């Protein structure tokens, strides 16, 4: 009985992880990146910049 419960919980956790990973990948693929020298915000590693580096503008 305990083993069955553990297996059910493990399957549910793995399913949830796969589901969130799929949603994350879909969102990442659907966003268009900001071209170099266009405004992106403050200093941070931006997923919206095509090259990923942001310092007020996307740095080439």
Swiss-Prot record:
<feature type="disulfide bond">
    <location>
        <begin position="40"/>
        <end position="54"/>
    </location>
</feature>
<keyword id="KW-0800">Toxin</keyword>
<keyword id="KW-1015">Disulfide bond</keyword>
<comment type="function">
    <text>Probable neurotoxin.</text>
</comment>
<keyword id="KW-0528">Neurotoxin</keyword>
<keyword id="KW-0964">Secreted</keyword>
<feature type="disulfide bond">
    <location>
        <begin position="33"/>
        <end position="50"/>
    </location>
</feature>
<keyword id="KW-0732">Signal</keyword>
<dbReference type="GO" id="GO:0090729">
    <property type="term" value="F:toxin activity"/>
</dbReference>
<keyword id="KW-0960">Knottin</keyword>
<feature type="signal peptide">
    <location>
        <begin position="1"/>
        <end position="22"/>
    </location>
</feature>
<comment type="similarity">
    <text>Belongs to the conotoxin O1 superfamily.</text>
</comment>
<dbReference type="GO" id="GO:0005576">
    <property type="term" value="C:extracellular region"/>
</dbReference>
<feature type="disulfide bond">
    <location>
        <begin position="49"/>
        <end position="58"/>
    </location>
</feature>
<protein>
    <recommendedName>
        <fullName>Conotoxin Cal6.29</fullName>
    </recommendedName>
</protein>
